């Protein structure tokens, strides 16, 4: 599963496309220059249960580590993933 990323420095998204259509998306907004707030995660029914949501959260963690920023997971799904993976605490 290839997770793509768009970022315009005020908001952004990690997403998955299939046949040229966005089938999953996790959106965020920037809070200053050193923090993003994950506010929503959505996965089309046809991709549910395949770990796509997890892959988008994992991509956000990699991005945060590379950029040396922190994440505030307001989205209930993202928050649940962060709770399951204590090794992600470094970006919270």
PLM ranges: what are they?
Residues 35-44:
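Conserved acetyl-CoA binding element of GNAT-fold acetyltransferases
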Residues 1-13:
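Active-site rim helix/loop that mediates acceptor-substrate recognition in acyltransferases
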Residues 47, 51-56:
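Conserved acetyl-CoA pyrophosphate-binding loop and the N-cap/start of the following alpha-helix
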Residues 19, 26-34:
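A conserved beta-strand-loop-helix scaffold within acyl/acetyltransferase catalytic domains
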